[in-house]
Amino acid sequence: DGALLAHILSIVATAGIDDRDAISRFLSKTFLASQMESETLEMRTDDVLHWLCENGMIDRTGESKQVKKRIKEMKTIDAEEEDWQDEMPSWANSASAIPGLDLIPKEESRTRRLSPRRGPAIFGFKKASMYEPSESFLPEPSAMTYSPTPLGSRVSRLYLNPISGRIIQDGLRKAMGIVSGEDNVGQVSPLSLLHLASCTPDFLPLWPRKNDYDAIQEALHGHERELLSTPVDLEEERRMKGTLVVHSWMDEDSLETIENDWGVQAGDLRSRVELLEWLLYAMRRILSEDESLARIDRGAHKTLFESIDEVHRRVRYGCKVDILGLVAIKGVGRVRAREMSDTLGVASASDVSLMTEGDRSRLSDLRGWSPRLVDKLVDSASKSVRRSR
């Protein structure tokens, strides 16, 4: 239950509600409590707390004497509030005094007499030996207290589904093993990081068309070494299609090409780009704040961080690595950046700020350009260079 996982992690990590009894009291006042039985809600809450503890989002910090005292006091207050007065109401007493008006006791309902059964006395049950044993957890003590881990706090502040946070951290740990040389089979590429983010429940996958399956299967098998995780819902084709579409975007394929190749229109592409941009940002933050991953290999940790940052910027701007320095200039998108790179060979704001009059003239002669636009971009590049000093 991703929603309940996120909400309980949030109230433990940020709301100061950090014991089992307080969590129950908080949830009992929510709309969810009106939609299910209290016992069911308590069981689901225990399951969620167990999952969060087992997956490194929160820690159990022991039973609190203060919480036990508070629970005892609250039980006394609740008992006083539930002291029912089961006496006859005043209106009934008044009505009974009216001549000719009697209170008639409710008669027992008559049941239809059934004929003797013809089948067995008991049916529809399985023998106990036929059931498969299932893992069960003891209920959390009411006085148990919890504290968020660094991972849990970060996941909560990033508004991630805790399952997404767990998938990302596991994938990053695998990537660290590859980059550090501990794993000599796998490889890390831009597609690896895109696919890791797309495997989370926070990503919205794309439905593959019939003619998409060959390309998707080819990618699944051809990039097998690069995959850092498996999809949360085992729908590999849908999530790989989302990965490949965004990969085409950051390889500078046009919107028309992406629509023709994948049947994905601009609005759907934009929504997936924004989701992956957010998830890659979250991935970068989780990696930077996870000291256990940094201790594996500081050099590999830095390399992986820089790789995620590069892919994040490529997804944001929809471009290849060589023009990342140009798209960061105000007013320069990926199309203009590519034209500047192909025409003049510039690659950074510093190069643009040093353009000669001849370079400016060549650029302004291109279709869609003008001397005024070129001067404006040179001014923006110069300001960017001054700010970076």
Describe each region flagged by the PLM.
Residues R60:
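Short beta-strand "wing" residues that participate in macromolecule-binding interfaces
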Residues E37, E63-Q66:
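C-terminal helical "lid" subdomain and adjoining coupling/linker elements of P-loop NTPases
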Residues D1-H50, M57, S96:
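C-terminal helicase lobe
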Residues G299, I308-R389:
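Accessory alpha-helical DNA-binding modules that contact the DNA backbone or grooves
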Residues S28, R285, R336-R338:
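Long C-terminal interaction/binding lobes of large macromolecular proteins
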Residues D46-V48, E54, D78-R334:
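C-terminal helical accessory/scaffold domains
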Residues G2, I17, E39, M43, ...:
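Intrinsic disorder
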